A protein has these predicted regions:
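N-terminal post-signal-peptidase region of extra-cytosolic proteins
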Residues: 57-67, 149-158
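Positively charged n-region of N-terminal signal peptides that target proteins for export
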Residues: 1-4
C-alpha cells in the first residue's frame, strides 16, 4: 500500500512538473516565398505569411520567428515553438514564435491573394503641410471614410507632386528590401485619376 501511495505521489509530481513547463505549443508551419502586407499598429507593414498543416489560407505573423532567417523566393516548412507571454510588451503580440527545426526550403513562388498587397484611392491637397520644419504631402482617404487631411510620410513612386494642384490617385503597394534582412512597404502610383488646379 505504501509503495502504491509513493508511486501515485511520484506520478502526480511528474505531471505537475510537465504542466508547469507546458506554457508553449509546438507547431508545423509553411512560410510563403513572399512577404505580404498587413495593417500594423500605426501603418502598413511587411509580414511573414504562414499556414499550418490544416489551414487553407495564409495568415500574417507580425512579430516574425526568432532564429529564422527568411530569404524571399523560397517556401519553407518549419517546426516552431509558440510561447504565450505572461506580460507581453505594449502594442505587441502576446505570443512569441521561435524556430525549432527547418524541415525544408524549396525555391518556388507561393500563391498569395491580392488582398495582401492592398490598393487604395488617395486625395492629395494642393498645399503641403509643415511638421517640425519639414514639408509633407497632405492627404485623405474619403472612400474609406477618412475625410480629415493628414500628414503623409512616405514616398510614392511615379508621383511628381506639383504644388497648387489637387490630385486623386490610385496607389498600389509592394514589399521591397532596404537592407539585408530588412524590408519595407513601397507605394506606387497605379493611375492618376484626377489633377485640378487649386480653387482660388
Amino acid at each position: 500500500m505504501r509503495k502504491y501511495i509513493i508511486l501515485l505521489f511520484i506520478s502526480a509530481f511528474a505531471l505537475g512538473a510537465c504542466d508547469k513547463n507546458d506554457d508553449y505549443t509546438v507547431r508545423e508551419w509553411t512560410v510563403a516565398s513572399q512577404l505580404g502586407i498587413s495593417h500594423g499598429f500605426h501603418t502598413l507593414q511587411p509580414v511573414l505569411l504562414v499556414k499550418a498543416n490544416d489551414d487553407t489560407s495564409w495568415r500574417a505573423v507580425y512579430e516574425g520567428i526568432e532564429g529564422f532567417d527568411y530569404e524571399p523566393g523560397y517556401e519553407y516548412k518549419l517546426r516552431i515553438k509558440a510561447k504565450q507571454l505572461a506580460e507581453p510588451p505594449q502594442d505587441a503580440s502576446s505570443v512569441r514564435y521561435s524556430l525549432l527545426e527547418l524541415i525544408s526550403k524549396i525555391p518556388t513562388r507561393s500563391n498569395i491573394p491580392d488582398s495582401y498587397y492592398p490598393t487604395f484611392t488617395m486625395e492629395v491637397a494642393p498645399e503641403p503641410v509643415s511638421y517640425y520644419g519639414e514639408l509633407y504631402l497632405s492627404v485623405r482617404f474619403p472612400e474609406v471614410g477618412l475625410n480629415d487631411w493628414q500628414r503623409w510620410s512616405f514616398r510614392i513612386e511615379g508621383f511628381d507632386y506639383e504644388q497648387g494642384y489637387s490630385y486623386k490617385l490610385k496607389v498600389g503597394t509592394s514589399v521591397v528590401g532596404v537592407d539585408e534582412g530588412y524590408y519595407t512597404v513601397q507605394y506606387s502610383v497605379l493611375e492618376m485619376l484626377d489633377k485640378q488646379p487649386a480653387q482660388e
